[in-house]
Amino acid sequence: SIRKQALWNGILMASIVLDNRGNLISVPILTELGISKTEKMKNALLEISLKIEDYIEGLNDTQTLDDDDLKEILKKIILKEIKILFSIRPVVNIHINRVQ
């Protein structure tokens, strides 16, 4: 269940702010709960944020319009990096905020 997964692997949240054309307005913000409070985690979150930024900036306008597809791809990017570094699969929540 999600509760057990969160208990054993933690939770990672990403907040992405886009304009109505899909351009990033600010740097993606990542926070974790119950994974690691180490410098390694801080560096990992920064690195993942940069990867998300690079990925979104490489998309065309129509690819950034579908929030569900974008969330799934970003979730895969996050999980891949966290699994490599920490050998866990946290619950990942992605919030996409659109600003006019």
PLM feature spans:
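Acidic/His-rich, metal-assisted hydrolase cores and their charged scaffolds
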Residues: 1-100
